[in-house]
């Protein structure tokens, strides 16, 4: 199942970091597909949503399990880490992959 976590290239992570402020402007909740920047749409997400912690770009969903890319909100005190649910892995500054077992 590890293959379900998206592989993000250096170029993709740079593109995502560059447009993160656009996504972070949205209020909490689902971000409509019509508002997805090209860098997000290229990941072919199932859904994109905003929380107080940041933006989740869900690329895999099965029942309660979810995986994808996370862009933290720099205004939040949230610190993504590997030891929790969801767990986070750093891809580049300001860009993480995440996995939630539910």
Task: Report each predicted region and the residues it spans.
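N-terminal export/targeting and maturation segments
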Residues: 4-52
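Short, solvent-exposed recognition patches
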Residues: 37-102
